[in-house]
Amino acid sequence: MLSKGKIIYPQRGEIYLVNFDPTIGSEIKKTRPALILQNDVSNQYSPITIVAALTSQFTEPLYPTEVLIKVPEGGLQVDSVALLNQIRSIDKQRLIKRLGVLESVTIEQVDRAIQISLGLVNLI
């Protein structure tokens, strides 16, 4: 991502406003906040990054692959849910602006939800 000629490297745990369009089918759509999941070394050298979309439209109880992020954490203006079942690789050109960063306790919840989403742990 370029800003005034300066290259900016997203870091794991940061929230960015991301343009997800165009999409196909049930993929998450429109410009919305997303959580950077990719490690910092890859974020420094790769033109792509891995993100999880956020939504402010959710119902409780949450699924095991969802993590609640309450205002003002991450620079969000409304309570939102990280959708760890909507993990996606994107070109960094889709990153619009940095909103904030998650607290370590929330990142731990995200890590657990990723493990569940990818089948790396048993739910039982």
Language-model segments: which ranges?
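C-terminal terminal-subdomain/extension
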Residues: 2-3, 8, 72-124
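Short, charged beta-turn/beta-strand-edge "cap" motif at the junction between a beta-strand
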Residues: 21-25
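Compact nucleic-acid interaction/catalytic patches
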Residues: 26-30, 36-72
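A structural motif
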Residues: 34-35, 51, 84, 110
